[in-house]
Amino acid sequence: MKAEIPITWAEVVDSTNSWASREMSVIDKMSVFAALYQTAGRGQRGNKWHSATGENLTFSIALRFGNSLTGNVRAMDQFVLTEVAALSVADFLSDKGADVRIKWPNDIYVRDRKICGMLIENSLRGDEVATSIVGIGINLNQRDFPAELANPTSLAIATGKEIGPKEALEDFLPFFLMRLEMSLTTEGRAEMRNDYLDILYRKDKPFPYRDNVTGEEFTGTIKGISDIGELLAEMPDKSIKSFSFKEIGYII
């Protein structure tokens, strides 16, 4: 897919997702908003996203659906946007030499350490996704992290290679556009699901988890994901249980 995607860079913003949200009304198909530093970067579950100034890649992709570039996404199929985002980052990092896995739903890990986090915010119109803001933070060159971050890593730590944020974004976007194009067809979506499962973190091996609904800890085995993107885990009694976002915690 060849497309000219508008990219706007800022030295400092509150958060790229908030910035993209403020600009959404004038976005036709797709635009990218990137910053060298965020004063209030946001992650999943309301967590703050930490990134040293200029050392990492923090950006948001704003998408409007119902056109030739983005296609149409039913609300019940919106997990495909998670697959597009996670796989495109995995493609980019793999191309740079990192051995990555996707920690459900969309964190990217190198071994047991987090190299990328995402915050995807969708708005619906009826039973269709109207817009999506895909916020992505990739640790590129940072080597020293705050002590409160439990398990961070970066491309520099994982591979010994450094790359500037602007160059990294230019290198990343073709992977995103390729995965977005795959999402336009049934065959492409099926291929993406297989690609996602192929690099799903901890798949088919027993590990400790926490049921965040009951508070109980258990040893389970991730078997895959459901049609709507729930995590499927084999429980100690060999039954298969589905978990929605925030319902399961990884004990690492």
What do the PLM-derived regions correspond to, one by one?
Residues 1-94, 116:
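N-terminal lobe of the biotin/lipoate ligase/transferase fold
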